[in-house]
């Protein structure tokens, strides 16, 4: 395979959302459900596209290749939560030469429940993966074969101060 010019790993192209015929929707938010599991239970991970003789298109450079496949006798799980009470963010981080992306999923689960407390206990310090789907049908993978996603914190559980306040758990 010929050496790839690092300046040509990804080919620039025009970006015009008005011409994005395949993706007409632009609804904000995520669907009120995520798929999750333990990092150690994954047999095969999707990965970044490989360098080729010709530069990757912008779309190829922004898409993982392959599927997430669980190990035998392991499974992924689903968490449903209150609609429009979760947010997924991708932010740039790092200094020049060390840039990367930080993904943050913030879920508010209406009503304090034993099951949510159990989830918090089961995931403390554990490497995880989460699959988040936005309202336009795009899937995002938190955690990969190199590093698992970690539950960073939460605003805790609260009953609220008044009878009209929300009884909830907040997870990050």
Give the role of each language-model region.
Residues 3, 18-102, 149-166:
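Solvent-exposed edge beta-strands and adjacent loop segments
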């Amino acid at each position: 395979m010929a050496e790839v010019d690092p300046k040509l790993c990804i080919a620039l192209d025009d970006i015009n959302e008005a011409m994005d015929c395949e993706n007409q929707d632009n609804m904000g938010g995520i669907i009120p459900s995520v798929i999750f599991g333990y990092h150690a239970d994954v047999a095969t991970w999707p990965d970044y596209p490989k360098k080729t003789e010709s530069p990757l298109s912008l779309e190829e450079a922004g898409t993982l290749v392959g599927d997430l496949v669980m190990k035998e006798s392991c499974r992924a799980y689903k968490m449903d939560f209150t609609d429009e009470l979760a947010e997924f963010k991708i932010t740039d981080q790092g200094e020049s030469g060390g840039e990367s992306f930080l993904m943050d999923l913030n879920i508010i689960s209406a009503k304090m429940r034993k099951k949510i407390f159990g989830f918090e206990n089961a995931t403390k310090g554990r490497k995880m993966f989460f699959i988040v789907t936005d309202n336009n049908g795009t899937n995002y993978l938190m955690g990969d074969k190199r590093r698992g996603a970690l539950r960073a914190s939460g605003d805790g559980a609260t009953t609220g101060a008044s009878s009209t306040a929300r009884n909830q758990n907040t997870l990050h």
